[in-house]
Curated annotation (Swiss-Prot):
Similarity comment text for this entry: Belongs to the UPF0122 family.
PANTHER family: UPF0122 PROTEIN CBO2450/CLC_2298 (PTHR40083), UPF0122 PROTEIN YLXM (PTHR40083:SF1)
HAMAP family registered for this protein in UniProt: UPF0122
Protein name: UPF0122 protein stu0888
Functional description taken from the UniProt entry: Might take part in the signal recognition particle (SRP) pathway. This is inferred from the conservation of its genetic proximity to ftsY/ffh. May be a regulatory protein.
Pfam families in the record: UPF0122
Transmembrane segments: none
NCBIfam families: PRK00118.1-1, PRK00118.1-4, PRK00118.1-6, YlxM
Species: Streptococcus thermophilus (strain ATCC BAA-250 / LMG 18311)
Length: 110
């Protein structure tokens, strides 16, 4: 499995998991976060390996569709880069550093 794809799916899952069904959440989490094989997931849920594969592929598409429409992950990446740039450029400005920390904590809350 490609590391870049795994990282992206895990990130998209973090942003959009609440929009998925329980089965979609379980399969994606086991496959990408816990590194289960298709066979292990199939055995766990009493379904065929093909059923797991189909569900994961559909869910990947759903996650990508959510990102295309909502841009939550890509916006988070841009905000994080801007925060990092400000923190570096204005390292001596304690007020600005504090405000950036507050904004960052808003992005990172559950």
């Amino acid at each position: 499995m490609e590391i870049e794809k795994t990282n992206r799916m895990n990130a998209l899952f973090e942003f959009y998991a609440a929009l998925l069904t329980d089965k979609q959440m379980n399969y994606i989490e086991l496959y990408y976060a816990d590194d289960y094989s298709l066979a292990e997931i199939a055995e766990e849920f009493g379904v065929s390996r093909q059923a797991v594969y189909d569900n994961i592929k559909r869910t990947e598409k759903i996650l990508e569709d959510y990102e295309m429409k909502l841009h939550m992950y890509s916006d988070y990446i841009v905000r994080s880069q801007i925060f990092d740039d400000i923190m570096e450029k204005y390292a001596d400005d304690s007020y600005l550093q504090e405000q950036i920390a507050i904004l960052s904590s808003i992005d990172n809350r559950d």
